[in-house]
C-alpha cells in the first residue's frame, strides 16, 4: 500500500490500523537544535483525544505519544523522529457481525475491490484513528514555525448542521467541547448533538483553519502551489468532501472589483484570496475551510450486500462520533502546519539569498 507519506523536505509517514497494537510515524526533515519533548506533542493530542465528552466517540484512548528517536538531551538532532501511540481500548468484537458485509459510506467496499481483502475491525487503515500521528507531527511543525517566524495556526468549528458559528472570540474555542468561537451557539449545538445521539444519527460540519504571520513567498509555481498542497493535505483527512481557500465558492457570485484584494502602502485592504496569490503566500493570513460529511455509522438500518453479493439490511455497531467535524479541528490544524512547514523549508533552501 502506497500513499502513506506527505511532504518533501518535511516528510511525514504514518503506519498502523484502528484496532492494531499501535500507530506510528516517521518524521523527516526536522531541523536540529529545537527543544522538543513528548509534552509538546501531547497538548494537541489531548485536544483530538476520543472519549473525553458525550459529544464524541466513547472509545477512550489516552493517546500517550512516545518519541523513539531524533531527540538527544531534549533537543532535535536533525535525524528522523520516530513516534508511537499505543491502542488500548479496541472493541474488535463489535465488528464481527460485519466481517462479510460492506458498510455503506465506508471504505469497506473500495478497499476490498482494490486489495482483495480488508481489515473489518473499525475500518483498519482507513479509520480516522490514523490521524493521531498526523496531529503529533503537526505539533512538531507548529512549534518550529512559531519559534522560527511566529506563525500561529488555529482552527474552529464554523458550522454543524444548520447552526453557523461566527468567529467572535478565539479564547472561547478551547473553553468548550465543540471548538466553537461563538458562545451564543453552544446551547443549540448541545441540543442538536444530544438529539442526534438519542436517535442514533449523525451530522456534517464545516471547519475553518487560519494561519497568521505566514511570510510572503511560500509555495511553488504551477503544480506545487501552496493552495494546491493545502487542498491535497486537507482532502486527505477522513470524511472531508470539500476544501475552500479564502472565499472559496463564494467567488462565483462576486464581481472582479469586489474579489480583488487591493493593495496600499499600508498593506492589503481585504483577503478574499485567503492569503495566497498565484499559489504563493502573500503575507496575509492563510485561510482554509473544510466540509466534512456526517459519519456513516449510525443506528438507522440501511441496505447493503455481502462480499458474496447477497442483499441484506445492516445496522452499524461500534463506537462512533456523532459529528466527526468536532475532533477534526486539531487534525486540520496539523495538516496545515505540515504543509506550511514543508514549504517554509523548501523556500529557505531555494530562496535564502533573495533580499
Curated annotation (Swiss-Prot):
Reaction(s) catalysed by this chain's protein: 5-O-(1-carboxyvinyl)-3-phosphoshikimate = chorismate + phosphate
One GO BP: chorismate biosynthetic process
GO cellular component, one term: cytosol
Cross-referenced HAMAP family: Chorismate_synth
Residues that coordinate or bind NADP(+): 48
Entry EC number(s): 4.2.3.5
Disulphide bonds in the chain: none
Positions contributing to FMN binding: 125-127, 238-239, 278, 293-297, 319
Organism domain of life: Bacteria
Taxonomic lineage of the native organism: Bacteria, Pseudomonadati, Pseudomonadota, Gammaproteobacteria, Candidatus Palibaumannia
Protein name: Chorismate synthase
Amino acid at each position: 500500500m502506497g500513499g502513506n507519506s506527505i511532504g518533501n523536505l518535511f516528510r511525514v509517514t504514518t503506519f498502523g490500523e484502528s484496532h492494531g497494537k499501535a500507530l506510528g510515524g516517521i518524521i523527516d526533515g526536522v531541523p536540529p537544535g529545537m527543544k522538543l519533548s513528548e509534552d509538546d506533542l501531547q497538548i494537541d493530542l489531548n485536544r483530538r483525544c476520543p472519549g473525553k465528552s458525550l459529544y464524541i466517540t466513547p472509545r477512550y484512548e489516552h493517546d500517550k505519544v512516545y518519541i523513539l528517536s531524533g531527540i538527544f538531551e531534549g533537543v532535535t538532532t536533525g535525524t528522523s523522529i520516530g513516534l508511537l501511540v499505543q491502542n488500548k481500548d479496541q472493541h474488535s468484537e463489535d465488528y464481527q457481525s460485519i466481517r462479510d458485509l460492506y458498510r455503506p459510506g465506508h471504505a469497506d467496499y473500495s478497499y476490498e475491490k482494490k486489495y482483495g481483502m480488508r481489515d473489518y475491525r473499525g475500518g483498519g487503515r482507513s479509520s480516522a484513528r490514523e490521524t493521531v500521528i498526523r496531529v503529533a507531527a503537526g505539533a512538531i511543525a507548529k512549534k518550529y514555525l512559531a519559534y522560527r517566524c511566529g506563525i500561529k495556526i488555529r482552527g474552529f468549528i464554523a458550522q454543524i448542521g444548520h447552526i453557523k458559528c461566527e468567529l467572535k472570540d478565539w479564547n472561547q474555542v478551547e473553553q468548550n467541547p465543540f471548538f466553537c468561537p461563538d458562545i451564543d451557539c453552544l446551547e443549540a449545538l448541545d441540543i442538536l448533538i444530544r438529539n442526534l445521539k438519542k436517535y442514533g444519527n449523525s451530522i456534517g460540519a464545516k471547519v475553518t483553519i487560519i494561519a497568521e504571520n505566514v511570510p510572503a513567498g511560500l509555495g511553488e509555481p504551477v503544480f506545487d502551489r501552496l493552495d494546491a498542497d493545502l487542498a491535497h493535505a486537507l482532502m486527505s483527512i477522513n470524511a472531508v468532501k470539500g476544501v475552500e481557500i479564502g472565499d472559496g465558492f463564494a467567488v462565483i457570485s462576486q464581481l472582479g472589483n469586489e474579489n480583488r484584494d487591493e493593495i496600499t502602502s499600508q498593506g492589503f485592504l481585504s483577503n478574499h484570496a485567503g492569503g495566497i496569490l498565484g499559489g504563493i503566500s502573500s503575507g496575509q493570513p492563510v485561510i482554509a475551510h473544510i466540509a466534512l460529511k456526517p459519519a456513516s455509522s449510525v443506528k438507522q438500518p440501511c441496505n447493503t450486500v455481502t462480499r458474496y453479493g447477497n442483499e441484506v439490511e445492516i445496522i452499524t455497531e461500534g463506537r462512533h462520533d456523532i459529528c466527526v467535524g468536532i475532533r477534526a479541528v486539531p487534525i486540520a490544524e496539523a495538516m496545515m502546519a505540515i504543509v506550511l512547514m514543508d514549504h517554509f523549508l523548501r523556500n529557505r533552501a531555494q530562496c535564502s539569498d533573495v533580499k
